[in-house]
Amino acid sequence: MCSILGSKIIDISKYGIIFSSLSKNLGISGSTLVIGRKDILSRPKLINPPIVMDWQPYIHLQGPTPTIMSIYMTNMNIKRMIKRGGITYYNSLTFAKSQLFYNFIDNSNDFYINDIPKENRSRTNITFTVKNSIHLSKLFCETAKQHNFIGTQYHPSNPNKGCRISLYNGLELSEVKLFIQFMKTFQNKFNFNDLQNSSLSS
C-alpha cells in the first residue's frame, strides 16, 4: 500500500484499516499512517493486542512522543502535492509514467522482458530482465550506475531476479523519458556489438 498511497485514487471506504509506512510517496521513513473506520477503532478491546496494533492511546493523545521530524516532512510534502494538483494530478502522472515505460519494454523486441500479465502489473514498481539473462541484467544495472542512474537493481531480498524501476512521485515524467533514452542506447550498443561479433565469427 505504501507504494501507491499518494499516487493513485483509492476508495478507502472499502477498507476497515489501512496500515502503511509513510515512506515512498507521502513522506520519509520513520512513521506509519493508520486510516481506520471509526466503528472499528472505537470497539472495546476483547484481547490485549500487540502494542503496534493498539491505536487507542494515539487517538486519545496519550501515546508516546511521535517522530516529529518525519511528520513535519510529510506535512510539507503533502502541502506541495496539493499545490501541484493533489491526488488527481499524481494519479494521472503515475499512469502516464508507467504506460510510457511499459510501452517501451513491450516494444523492445524482447530485449527487455516483463513477464507479468498486463492486468496484474504495478504502476509504481516495474520489474524486468535484459534478454531474460541475469548476467546481462546485472551488466545493465552497472552501466546505468555509471551514467548516474542508481537503484535499478531488483529488490535486495532477491538480487538475482533482474532489474526494478520505481516510479514514485519524486520521479518526473521528463526523468523517465531520460532513462528510457539510456535504455535505448544500451540496447542499440548491445545489438551493434552482437552483430559485430556475429560477423567476425562468420
Q: Model regions: which residues?
A:
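Conserved active-site segment immediately N-terminal to the catalytic lysine
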Residues: 11-23
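PLP-dependent enzyme catalytic core of the Aspartate aminotransferase-like
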Residues: 157-202
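Catalytic PLP-binding core of fold-type I/II PLP enzymes
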Residues: 1-10
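Short amphipathic alpha-helices in soluble, non-transmembrane regions
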Residues: 137-145, 178-184
